[in-house]
Amino acid sequence: GLGDVYKRQEYQTAKCFPPKNQIFRAIELTPFDEVKVVIIGQDPYHNDNQANGLCFSVSDKVKAPPSLKNIFKELEDDLGIKKTSNELEMWAKQGVLLLNATLTVRAHEANSHKDLGWEQFTDFIIKEISDKKENVVFVLWGAFAQKKAGLIDTSKHFIIQSAHPSPFSVHKGFFGSRPFSKINQFLEEKGKEPINW
C-alpha cells in the first residue's frame, strides 16, 4: 500500500532507524509458534546506533538509555540478576516478542513514523497471538501500551500492566512491580519453561 511506498522513500531520503535489515527483527527472532511473552513498546529509539529492531533493546556499542537502565534495575531488585549486555536478543530467542507498535522512526524525531500504518500491522500481530494462542503474558508498560489491552482476550492470557520504565514515570509504579518473577510464575503454572532473564 501507500504506507509501504512511503516507508521505502523515507529510508531513501531521510536517515531512519533501525537499519533496514532489522525492521522486522522482533518477529524474525521470536516466531509465532514460540511466543510466550509479548512486551509492547511505542516506537524505536531515534538516536544513532540505538534501535536494533527489538523494543527497549540497544546494541552494546552505546550506553543503555534511561528506560532500559530502569528495566535492568527492576530485574535486579526482582530476581537478583545483573545484566551485562544492553542487547535483549537472548530474551527474544526464548519466546519474548519485543514488539514496537511502530517499527521505524526518522533520526532524532521521536514518533515521526506513527502515521505510516505500522500500527495496523502490529495490532494485527497482537490480535493474532491473542486469538490463536493461549497462556501468553502481555506486558503493557505505560499508557500507550495499555491502550492495546482491548486487543487481548483476558480469559486465556495474562496481562501485566504498570507505569512505564521511563524516568518520568518509573516511580509511579514501575519500580517494585516485579514483572519478571510474575511472568515466570505464570509460565511455570501453565507448564511452560520460564524465561532465563
Please provide the spans of the model-predicted regions.
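Short, small-residue-biased leader/transition segments that mark boundaries at the very start
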Residues: 1-6
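Short, catalytically relevant binding-site loops at active-site mouths
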Residues: 44-45, 90, 104-106
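Flexible, compositionally biased loop and terminal segments
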Residues: 33-35, 83-94, 99, 124-125
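Adenosine ribonucleotide-centric catalytic and binding domains
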Residues: 29-83
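Short clusters of hydrophobic/aromatic residues that line enzyme substrate/ligand-binding pockets
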Residues: 23, 54-56, 88, 175, ...
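A short acidic-Thr-Gly-centered motif at the start of a beta-strand
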Residues: 24-33, 129-131
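Glycine/proline-rich loop-helix segments at beta-alpha junctions forming the active-site rim
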Residues: 94-197
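Short coil-to-helix leader/linker segments, especially the first N-terminal amphipathic alpha-helix
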Residues: 7-25, 78-79
